[in-house]
Amino acid sequence: MRYNLSNICDYVKGKIDVAVLDEDKYISTENMMSNKGGITRAASLPTVIQTQAFLPGDVLVSNIRPYFKKIWFAEFDGGCSNDVLVFRARDGINKRFLYYVLADDAFFEYSMATSKGTKMPRGDKAVIMKYEVPDFTYEEQEKIAGVLEALDKKIQLNAEINNNLAA
């Protein structure tokens, strides 16, 4: 059986004062890395008073040009640009499992196919929540997320080793 994304998560709507943020705690589309590469330090903070808030365990996805596949599993609390979608897993949904559902290339392809605009396509927030996801028990979600997280850690370790060899 399959569900819509809206059955397993919600968009976060909370705000945070920019005054309590620094460049390490602010995420925008500019400091999200392409191809699921995580984040870097922001170059600057926005000039607005408040921005969208996120918490550890939330999943942040750039909503501009989805083909860049910019996604990050939040490891700390902070604030982000309005061009970044913040997803929060509902009760009974494993947070890492949600991350891997959204990190799947099929999600980015769906987001592009249903996006609006040509030069700077944006995902349609209402349609994104209709993305179909498989129905797994919490225990199955934990197992799937555990295997994928172990693979991600191995890939990251191999990349660090390669960088050290190149240096």
State where each predicted segment sits.
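Active-site donor-binding loop signature of nucleotide-sugar glycosyltransferases
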Residues: 29, 89, 133
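A short beta-sheet element
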Residues: 50-52, 56-108, 112
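Sequence-specific dsDNA recognition surfaces
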Residues: 4-56
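Residues that recognize and position ribonucleotide moieties
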Residues: 1, 25, 78, 100, ...
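Non-catalytic DNA-recognition/assembly elements of restriction-modification systems
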Residues: 1-16, 32, 130, 134, ...
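Short beta-turn/strand-loop junction motif enriched in small, turn-promoting residues
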Residues: 13-15, 67, 116-117
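A short glycine-rich beta-alpha junction/loop motif
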Residues: 79-83, 116-145
